[in-house]
Amino acid sequence: MNDIKNIRNIGIIAHVDAGKTTTTERILFFSGFSHKIGEVHTGNTITDWMKQEQERGITITSASVTFFWKTNFYNSSINLIDTPGHVDFTIEVERSLRVLDGAVILICASSGIQPQTETVWNQSEKFNIPKILFVNKLDRIGAKYLSIIENIKKKFFCNILIINLNIGIENSFSGIIDLINMKELIWNNSQLEIRNITNKNFDISNKYRNILLETLSEYDDIFLEKYINSNFSIKDIIESIRKLVILNKIIPIACGSSLKNKGIEFLLDSIVNFLPSPIDIGIKNVSNINYSVNIKSKFLALLFKVFNDPYLGLLSFIRIYSGKIEPGQIIFNNSKNIKEKIFRIIRMFANSKKDLNIASAGDIVVLIGLKNSFTGDTLSFDNEKVLLEKINIPLPVISVSVEPIVKNDYEKLLNLINKFCKEDPSLLFKINENTGELILSGMGELHLEIIIDRINNEFNIKTKTSKPQVSYKESIKKTIIQEGKYIKQTGGRGQYGHVVLKIEPILIEKDDFIFKIEVVGGVIPKEYFLSIEKGILEQIKCGVVLGYPVTKIKITLINGSFHPVDSSEYAFKNAASIALKEALKKANSFLLEPIMKVEIISPKEYLGIVISDISKKRGNIISVVDNNNNLKIINSLIPLRELFGYSTDLRSNTKGRANYNMEFHNYSETPNYILEKIKKK
């Protein structure tokens, strides 16, 4: 076991193609974890181990690796998670960041801030994660460093601390200036030479070193006193940066080129020296004194991911916040009020594994043996009603129907899709009650394409699918009070359930669904509350406009009655479903469609035709800005319904010279004329 203060739980996050996996491969090589550098373009990287990742050259699932790095001040064990950059796999970033203590955000030196950069930045801010920025690809044509830093300050309103400078740019990028140690780091054929600052770089080095020291003095009174008296050391600088990073008062930024092996050692030093240990962060939102980041405290962990291994079964990825566990122990799932047994504890090295005899506070490990625990569940030894903050699951926006070519494979397909949905909470499925079709819903075309590819090739169930369809939602505009009764009398024991529900739209809260119980005086016994909730949850899966799931709705049980003999869970479940269905009919239900945030990068001469096409697609322009390379960046909001085949349209309109990225923005009311078109289909 490692000293907890030396553990670093970090993630690498960025827009797709910013170089996350390439950076991870270099980190693993320079740390001694691997003896050969994997390359994305040859499909032999350690963290992109899935066949689909290697074929496409992208990260699909977050991969965990553990390695070691020593600086002059720390000898650290680093649990590193390489996350996807593609918007379709946002859930992988979300659940990884939930359990990490620090992050490295990569930014491409030539592309700058991109849409998914904003998304992962906001995700890291949501969890108050201390971070380091690494401007990658300084060797690229069009690369910039200082101007990107200014853009970051303007975009995110943050205090950036420049800790190194580039020596040369684009093809002439040869090294960096370490502003902490005031040394030049030069790479010749991947060989590192450390030398004193040359006369050529002396003035700019002094300028930015002074800015660094003055920034630390502004936020750290202890360092200020040493700075005024000119009585500070390198250790004092590092300790001050570390303290301010952990407090989220500053964000260090460095530059390099992962592909060219330049700046990786400096980045590793920065991760270990500046990013927090589990002790520095503690256990967020838990005040129970029985739990602390200590091996002697009670066991407490969050299950943040599950994965079905073809040989080992269900792998449960957990972050341990308090205490310790060993194989063979019985643990308690606080979220579901059930017990589970740990058969094995393993540490993951991407797709390879090592058995452990013990795991303790600060660790990220995998449990084998858990059967009914899934993403977001809190685990402990005792049911003390302690629940860690859950993981936010995004709503799917696109659907396809899936059916097996061989009819006998239907049950196998159904079971497999059910397993995939447990692995990936942003993936949902339902069975069309009229046609019996399996409808699979996900975050985008690529998301569903990967799943279908795994079904066909990895599990050898050949399928046919429909064209992608938009996943609409439904909501309400009016508040309604509605009763529902389910009464049956057939000679023997009857059925009696009676509820009164108040339904109202959620206008402000972030929740998509709220259920509250406000009955008093025992008008309905407590043992029927769960059945009533089940009836409600079943009914909101099918709205009254077009049968889509209902969202942004608050439902309160306010009254009802029961029969001492005839009442049953079944009767109350049906009564709740009946009440809700009738209420939805009266509450001005309406259809919601997903709106996508689209960034288009196009040569200036095609700006007019691109904007005209956006208008035809019911889009709204947010901004049009220059990117200093004779290109225009058009940011817009466009309904997903209008974006099928957009790649072809954009290529045609710009002779193949424009490209675009998109991510989910929100759900918005569908205009009536579009609703009528959907109904006709």
Curated annotation (Swiss-Prot):
<dbReference type="Pfam" id="PF00679">
    <property type="entry name" value="EFG_C"/>
</dbReference>
<feature type="binding site">
    <location>
        <begin position="82"/>
        <end position="86"/>
    </location>
    <ligand>
        <name>GTP</name>
    </ligand>
</feature>
<feature type="domain" description="tr-type G">
    <location>
        <begin position="5"/>
        <end position="279"/>
    </location>
</feature>
<dbReference type="GO" id="GO:0003746">
    <property type="term" value="F:translation elongation factor activity"/>
</dbReference>
<dbReference type="InterPro" id="IPR053905">
    <property type="entry name" value="EF-G-like_DII"/>
</dbReference>
<dbReference type="InterPro" id="IPR041095">
    <property type="entry name" value="EFG_II"/>
</dbReference>
<dbReference type="InterPro" id="IPR009022">
    <property type="entry name" value="EFG_III"/>
</dbReference>
<keyword id="KW-0251">Elongation factor</keyword>
<keyword id="KW-0648">Protein biosynthesis</keyword>
<comment type="function">
    <text>Catalyzes the GTP-dependent ribosomal translocation step during translation elongation. During this step, the ribosome changes from the pre-translocational (PRE) to the post-translocational (POST) state as the newly formed A-site-bound peptidyl-tRNA and P-site-bound deacylated tRNA move to the P and E sites, respectively. Catalyzes the coordinated movement of the two tRNA molecules, the mRNA and conformational changes in the ribosome.</text>
</comment>
<dbReference type="GO" id="GO:0097216">
    <property type="term" value="F:guanosine tetraphosphate binding"/>
</dbReference>
<dbReference type="InterPro" id="IPR020568">
    <property type="entry name" value="Ribosomal_Su5_D2-typ_SF"/>
</dbReference>
<dbReference type="InterPro" id="IPR035647">
    <property type="entry name" value="EFG_III/V"/>
</dbReference>
<dbReference type="GO" id="GO:0005525">
    <property type="term" value="F:GTP binding"/>
</dbReference>
<dbReference type="InterPro" id="IPR031157">
    <property type="entry name" value="G_TR_CS"/>
</dbReference>
<keyword id="KW-0547">Nucleotide-binding</keyword>
<dbReference type="InterPro" id="IPR004540">
    <property type="entry name" value="Transl_elong_EFG/EF2"/>
</dbReference>
<dbReference type="InterPro" id="IPR005225">
    <property type="entry name" value="Small_GTP-bd"/>
</dbReference>
<dbReference type="InterPro" id="IPR005517">
    <property type="entry name" value="Transl_elong_EFG/EF2_IV"/>
</dbReference>
<dbReference type="Pfam" id="PF00009">
    <property type="entry name" value="GTP_EFTU"/>
</dbReference>
<keyword id="KW-0963">Cytoplasm</keyword>
<dbReference type="GO" id="GO:0003924">
    <property type="term" value="F:GTPase activity"/>
</dbReference>
<dbReference type="Pfam" id="PF22042">
    <property type="entry name" value="EF-G_D2"/>
</dbReference>
<dbReference type="InterPro" id="IPR014721">
    <property type="entry name" value="Ribsml_uS5_D2-typ_fold_subgr"/>
</dbReference>
<dbReference type="InterPro" id="IPR047872">
    <property type="entry name" value="EFG_IV"/>
</dbReference>
<dbReference type="Pfam" id="PF03764">
    <property type="entry name" value="EFG_IV"/>
</dbReference>
<dbReference type="InterPro" id="IPR027417">
    <property type="entry name" value="P-loop_NTPase"/>
</dbReference>
<dbReference type="Pfam" id="PF14492">
    <property type="entry name" value="EFG_III"/>
</dbReference>
<dbReference type="InterPro" id="IPR035649">
    <property type="entry name" value="EFG_V"/>
</dbReference>
<protein>
    <recommendedName>
        <fullName>Elongation factor G</fullName>
    </recommendedName>
</protein>
<feature type="binding site">
    <location>
        <begin position="136"/>
        <end position="139"/>
    </location>
    <ligand>
        <name>GTP</name>
    </ligand>
</feature>
<dbReference type="InterPro" id="IPR000795">
    <property type="entry name" value="T_Tr_GTP-bd_dom"/>
</dbReference>
<dbReference type="GO" id="GO:0005737">
    <property type="term" value="C:cytoplasm"/>
</dbReference>
<keyword id="KW-0342">GTP-binding</keyword>
<dbReference type="InterPro" id="IPR000640">
    <property type="entry name" value="EFG_V-like"/>
</dbReference>
<feature type="binding site">
    <location>
        <begin position="14"/>
        <end position="21"/>
    </location>
    <ligand>
        <name>GTP</name>
    </ligand>
</feature>
<dbReference type="GO" id="GO:0032790">
    <property type="term" value="P:ribosome disassembly"/>
</dbReference>
<dbReference type="InterPro" id="IPR009000">
    <property type="entry name" value="Transl_B-barrel_sf"/>
</dbReference>
<comment type="similarity">
    <text>Belongs to the TRAFAC class translation factor GTPase superfamily. Classic translation factor GTPase family. EF-G/EF-2 subfamily.</text>
</comment>
